[in-house]
C-alpha cells in the first residue's frame, strides 16, 4: 500500500503549517500534496492529485459545519473529508455524517487523534473525536427482547471510537470472528445496515456525545 495523499485547508496559515509539520513526522505513511488557505484551490488540488484525505478546517464569515462539507462535496471530490475544527456547539455530528464527512477531529485534541482519524478512514471506517458512550445508558434504551448485552455495548463504544474489528479483537482479547459476530448482532438489534448508520443511531439515542 502506498502513501496516503492528503490535502489540508484552513483559514489560518499557521494551522496549515502545523498540520503539515506534524504529518511530516510520518514520511512513510503520508504525503501532503498541498496546504491552502484558498478553499477552491484546495479542492482543485484534491481532484488534480487524486488525494485520499482532505483535512477541512474553518473559514470565517461563511459556511461552517455540515453546510461547508456539503459545499465541498458538491465539487465532486473523491477525497474523504475530515473536519478539523474547534469544539463548538454548532458542530452537529449527525449532520456532518449526512453531509458526507467521514470524520471530525477537534483542534484541541492530542495530535495522535489525527493519525487515528486518517488511518481509520483510509481503511473504510469513520472517526469522530471524543466519543464517550455510557454502556448502562445504551442498555436502558431497549426492551428485554432487543437489549444490548454488556459486551455488545462495550464493542459499540469501541466502534464509535473508530477502532477496526482487528483492533477491538486485540483490545478485548477476542477473536476477530467473535467481534464481527457481535457487530452484526448490534446492527440487527439497532436495525441499521452500515457503520455510519450505527454511529448515527447511537447519537440519536443520546448515548454518545461528540
Curated annotation (Swiss-Prot):
Query: Which terms does the UniProt entry file under GO BP?
Result: phosphorelay signal transduction system; regulation of DNA-templated transcription
DNA-binding region(s), residue ranges: 165-184
Q: Which UniProt keywords apply?
A: DNA-binding, Transcription, Transcription regulation
Chain ranges of the HTH luxR-type domain: 141-206
Show the GO MF annotations.
DNA binding
A Pfam cross-reference name: Response_reg
State the PROSITE patterns in the record.
HTH_LUXR_1, HTH_LUXR_2, RESPONSE_REGULATORY
What InterPro entries does the record point to? CheY-like_superfamily (IPR011006), Sig_transdc_resp-reg_C-effctor (IPR016032), Sig_transdc_resp-reg_receiver (IPR001789), Tscrpt_reg_LuxR_C (IPR000792), WalR-like (IPR039420)
Q: Which domain of life is it from?
A: Bacteria
| Keyword hit for rRNA-binding | no
Q: Does the keyword Protease apply?
A: no
Q: Which Gene3D superfamilies match?
A: 3.40.50.2300
> Domain named Response regulatory: which ranges?
5-122
Which protein are we looking at? Uncharacterized response regulatory protein YgeK
Q: Which organism is it from?
A: Escherichia coli O157:H7
Q: Which gene encodes it?
A: ygeK
